[in-house]
Amino acid sequence: MFDKYRKTLVAGTVAITLGLSASGVMAAGFKPAPPAGQLGAVIVDPYGNAPLTALVDLDSHVISDVKVTVHGKGEKGVEISYPVGQESLKTYDGVPIFGLYQKFANKVTVEWKENGKVMKDDYVVHTSAIVNNYMDNRSISDLQQTKVIKVAPGFEDRLYLVNTHTFTAQGXDLHWHGEKDKNAGILDAGPATGALPFDIAPFTFIVDTEGEYRWWLDQDTFYDGRDRDINKRGYLMGIRETPRGTFTAVQGQHWYEFDMMGQVLEDHKLPRGFADATHESIETPNGTVLLRVGKSNYRRDDGVHVTTIRDHILEVDKSGRVVDVWDLTKILDPKRDALLGALDAGAVCVNVDLAHAGQQAKLEPDTPFGDALGVGPGRNWAHVNSIAYDAKDDSIILSSRHQGVVKIGRDKQVKWILAPSKGWEKPLASKLLKPVDANGKPITCNENGLCENSDFDFTYTQHTAWISSKGTLTIFDNGDGRHLEQPALPTMKYSRFVEYKIDEKKGTVQQVWEYGKERGYDFYSPITSIIEYQADRNTMFGFGGSIHLFDVGQPTVGKLNEIDYKTKEVKVEIDVLSDKPNQTHYRALLVRPQQMFK
């Protein structure tokens, strides 16, 4: 009876199969999206990480001379137009569409050549609203609002990537376990060490000169604030463009490479023995990547093991293997505290304490290890926040927020130091650059950096000490602890965009350009921020990331600027307002679609 039933079942299956074949019906499943024009289907957010992008599938077409235009919204909308090269066409197997508006029926034109003919398609690409996954009772708005102050003629096409963040409801809930005192029992609490609590949700977007969001990196791409997984925690920072139009970045225990379509090209854990990557990543002409990290299980001179804070530079290749290491605890002087004791206790990098804003920091000899001001390995004595690579002599230039700007060779020897002279001992004291005026005449400055009868000034708690295309050194001079003291009133503080010319043979430094002092406290960013010279329009681009940080209950202003180099006229000024009060921004950078899809 069982055999009879089995034969009937098999016969029925065969009949159904033959019936499907006879009628030409496809196998079970839904049909793919049909072509939207003369090429293939349009796929919004093809990699699941950038919802304001799309892809026109090639559908096996072989095309060339591709140009994409995303039309502006309304009469004043900013049009985004760019070419697409063969490498990108092959990488995506489609035409990349970048710069869509959120929750909008975007009009997009794609032009190309195929079989010697000029072709063109117009598309309507629908997008949904972008979402901030990290809102709580502190939220002022869902997204970070923008306010366009000024855009001069000729700058309407500018696009700015804003690398900012938003607080999570749980705050910093993870710590590295430090080494217990030798007399501690097994049940005694263990101390914290390292910078694992440096943890916040990313908020990464591109804004146009109408203040519209034109790109968004999904917050879940690299981060997960709902799971206690250190591989998905940290502070997404150091977003820098590569020559290929991709971007490197760091976050906690990983470093990445990604592109504007949201494709993650590299995702590497930090090498064993290192932790807490923040602030900076940069690809060198050799194809390696420089990262700022801390050292795990570092044995101090007193025998105590700690995780160090922002004082090691790693060079890694694209497979993640270590090429070189700069250990600043051996190269510099981790006991120097000349600036540390002059800082505002209310803000150190993005660690903000409103209760102590405006008060001068106090250095205690027994300061606990961890992400706190203090001297020696295991404390925040260096705070390196930027790296520049100088190809002419295979050296690196570091902005050490708590020490100064330093150039170090491949041999780990200091070439020069740009900082006030106080606290530097031999042999490092001999590396201090000597200020000169435009005629090469020495400028007299006291040990705190106050200079006589001159506009020259050093930088204090600075960021982004980078080499410009002119060969000069440009720096965002935050200005906290200026002249190694706190002023009588907090409102006397100011920040500057500043440019120096360094003569390495003579060991001198000349200040050749500055901007911002005249704008006073309303331009003051105590922490974070960036400047970078833009040769295409002879401007100094800057982003003050922490303006009005200490205004209780108010959004923090991130101010995007382009300043005419010759006249110092403001060409662009756009404010970005944090979505929660007293929450700092980090950096911003100019992006050029014309260079991103080669």
From Swiss-Prot:
Catalytic site positions: H463 (nucleophile)
Coiled coil regions, renumbered to chain: none
Record EC number: 2.8.2.22
Secretion signal, residue range per the UniProt entry: 1-27
Disulfide bridge partners, by residue number: C445-C451
Binding locations of 4-methylumbelliferone: H279, H383, H463
Localization terms from the record: Periplasm
Enzymatic class: transferase
Function of the protein: Catalyzes the transfer of a sulfate group from a phenyl sulfate ester to other phenolic compounds. In vitro, is able to use 4-methylumbelliferyl sulfate and p-nitrophenyl sulfate (PNS) as donor substrates with phenol as the acceptor substrate. Cannot use 3'-phosphoadenosine-5'-phophosulfate (PAPS), the donor substrate of mammalian sulfotransferase.
Family, similarity comment: Belongs to the aryl sulfotransferase family.
Full protein name: Arylsulfate sulfotransferase AssT
Organism this protein belongs to: Escherichia coli O6:H1 (strain CFT073 / ATCC 700928 / UPEC)
Lineage of the species this protein comes from: Bacteria, Pseudomonadati, Pseudomonadota, Gammaproteobacteria, Enterobacterales
Gene that encodes the chain: assT
